[in-house]
Amino acid sequence: MQTLAENLTSQAISPTLEKLILTLANTSKEISHAVRHGALAGVLGATEQENVQGETQKKLDIITNDMLKDALKADGTVRGIASEEEDYVVEADANGEFLVCFDPLDGSSNIDINSLVGTIFSVLPAPAGELTEKSFLQAGRNQVAAGYVLYGPSTMLALTTGQGVQLFTLNPETNEFLLTNGAMAISKDTGEFAINMSNQRFWEAPMQTYISDLLLGKIGPREKSFNMRWIAAMVGDVHRVLCRGGIFTYPTDNKNPEKPYKLRLMYEANPMAFLVEQAGGKASTGYETIMDIQPTEIHQRVAVILGSANEVDACLEYHGIDYSEEPVL
């Protein structure tokens, strides 16, 4: 099997980007080790701190954030860093070519129950001049690489450099990432959807109607049955979509009118959208393509609808309907 390093060489990417990706991959091996040891290493549980999102930080959130931050600052290829766990951007190497945005441990609410978690990352070109938050405010189309590492029964790395999506599995005996799928492809049609149904009453009318029609199955307007899946970690739900198709959505809701969106654009939605599009799927907010959004802040949140192309299109058709005369279910 081809190693990650061998695969990157075959992609003919720049040596600096190759070095950066290998640094991310090597750090994820250390994170995988920390996740596996869990309670044995005393890294489970919550701290008394909150991140910039107002979310209580888990011990592993902080540990994994520091692992990635330290590795990227020492790498020499990175100009600056933006993380879910950092209030502000972090300077790295003044001569670095890239900016890295990451969620160090997506799905951290799953940590204490020994369920799926992962690391999500996005790589952008570093513009010339002083490093500021504005340096990071680039549309997702500017990404030069993106991926995630899933810490499950196996540790897996899904990666794109704009040349399709490759899946690597960590060999625990050699500690090497080996290529196990050289061309991930999302099926255009699906019978699975992933959504947090507990928020149904807070969704916009288009999403309420769309999901209601899915639940009606063969007797409804879609005339087919759908199964629901929900892992409560974007990285796990998107991994399933990449492996066997499906639609994943965390839509707009009015549960907290000041925070109508859940997922962060720069280090969750954009990298996942890049992966999904490279695998033949689609990614939208319901009203615009995710990777076309011009960010206004590094911790900006957006609605997310992504997955099998035909099913995303079907969902978007509901968002094109005038619901002004329709009752909200």
Swiss-Prot record:
Chain residues that bind Mg(2+) 2: 103, 106, 268
UniProt key word Hydrolase: yes
Record keywords, A-Z: Carbohydrate metabolism, Cytoplasm, Hydrolase, Magnesium, Metal-binding
GO cellular component labels: cytosol
Cofactor binding mode and count: Binds 2 magnesium ions per subunit.
Chief location category: cytoplasm
Co-factor requirement: Mg(2+)
One Pfam family named in its UniProt record: FBPase
A Gene Ontology biological process term: fructose metabolic process
EC number: 3.1.3.11
Positions of substrate binding: 106-109, 196, 262
Organism domain of life: Bacteria
Subunit (UniProt): Homotetramer.
Family from the record: Belongs to the FBPase class 1 family.
Protein name: Fructose-1,6-bisphosphatase class 1
